[in-house]
Amino acid sequence: MSKEISLVYMVAGMSSRFGWKIKQFSKVWPDNTTLIEYSLKQALPAGFSKIIFIVGKMTELPFKEMFWNDYKWIPVEYALQKFDETRRDRPRWTVDALCSAKNNIDWSFVVCNGDDIYGSESFKILYNHLEKSEYSATLWYILGNVIPDEWSTNRGIFKVDLDNNVTDIKEIIWIEKNKLTEIWLKTEDLCSMNIFWLSKSALEWLYTILNTFKTNNMWDRRIECYLPVEISNLIKEEWLKMKLYPTPDTRFWVTNPEDEEIVKKQIEEYENNKL
């Protein structure tokens, strides 16, 4: 009997690089399928029981208008990520986003970015992991393959033991493809793309961490609470064990408006190669 697992998408943010439009609504397929619909097309065959969108005040209504209360007969729920604009310039990033959905998450879940295409096998790997292990799990990507050519980006860099258990995830910011060696990175390093299988108890621990973070940084308008960093802290404190898996899938992403056509061509080629 399959276990209940939720699929949680972080879709609260809007990017200045993308002209303050919703990246997840980029048309990436000839029939006008959006990026988020294509991601769901890949994910749902794995067997997820519920879809949860973590939205912001600018994305809440558009997502509700697109998906309503169900998608492909799977229940859809929404969690609103809020922040105090008198104290903050923006939300506290991904731990804050995930904890916004605390009351929507009833069981184990996979959480991921809403503007990335991870591939159908990636979701199957994480979903199937639950059938054989109670550990948390995540996927690795080759760093050199997931850095934009012209823009800096952030990535969580993995360290693992001989049994492919994650021992550390170090969040590196402002990574530039042509300057890796300057910050002691290599193109072949294994990195995170913010897709994790986690338990309900892990979410409770992250919620406690977030509350402490908020108290300790009450007046800092920009400091952020990164999901890979706090997962790493739970691992180091032995509250969490996490398996790391390779994925055969190619990951696609949209950063700038011109990426929409690029990704559309990449996905078309990807689909044709599957035939």
Protein language model regions, located:
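Conserved alpha/beta core of the MobA/IspD/sugar-nucleotide pyrophosphorylase nucleotidyltransferase superfamily
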Residues: I169-I172, K177-L275
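Short beta-strand-to-loop acidic/aromatic patch adjacent to the donor-nucleotide binding site
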Residues: W107-I117
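Residues at the starts of beta-strands that form the adenosine-phosphate
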Residues: S49-I51, P75, S108, Y135-A137, ...
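Conserved core of the sugar-phosphate nucleotidyltransferase
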Residues: G119-E204
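Short phosphate-binding loop-to-helix
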Residues: Y71-S108
